[in-house]
A protein has these predicted regions:
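Iron-sulfur-associated redox domains of electron-transfer enzymes in respiratory
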Residues: 1-148
Length: 148
């Protein structure tokens, strides 16, 4: 009924180019690499789900929008009290940091959002079982987001 073809546990370097029914993206769009991954996922999937507050709203990484990318990177990699000889990463593999962190839907069309940090298992289960039943929920019911 369900076949997982690509995940961080298997291999993200060579996902299928087509035939993917549901794609699941987590994490905010923080750099140029994230943009490319989101675009590839959108091209290859019939349905794209943004999972977690970071993918849905930008989450904690979007807090850097308040101070700017340069200030945030300098604080994180150079000025922290535990850092000795810090260097801000500069790698093509990591991608160039964006000036503004956003949720996935600011880059590509997202069909379903499952917010939460982390998302509740009930919410994720509801979304996946609805999709397996051939329904794409527009809004997840409030009871799957109730926190005690």
């Amino acid at each position: 009924m369900v076949e997982f073809t690509s995940s961080p546990i298997t291999d993200l370097k060579h996902p299928p180019k087509s035939g993917v029914t549901v794609g699941i993206l987590e994490g905010a769009i923080c750099n140029t690499h994230n943009i490319e991954v989101a675009k590839q996922m959108r091209e290859r999937c019939d349905i794209l789900i943004a999972v977690g507050d970071c993918a849905t709203f930008g989450g904690v990484p979007a807090m850097r929008n308040l101070v700017g990318t340069d200030v945030a990177l300098k604080r994180a990699y150079i000025e922290t009290e535990s850092t000795v000889d810090g260097v801000i990463p500069d790698s093509l593999e990591l991608g160039k940091p964006l000036d503004f962190v956003v949720g996935v839907d600011k880059i590509v069309k997202v069909d379903l959002f499952v917010p939460g940090c982390p998302p509740r298992a009930d919410a994720f289960y509801y979304a996946l079982t609805e999709l397996l039943a051939g329904r794409t929920p527009v809004v997840l019911p409030p009871e799957v987001f109730t926190y005690d």
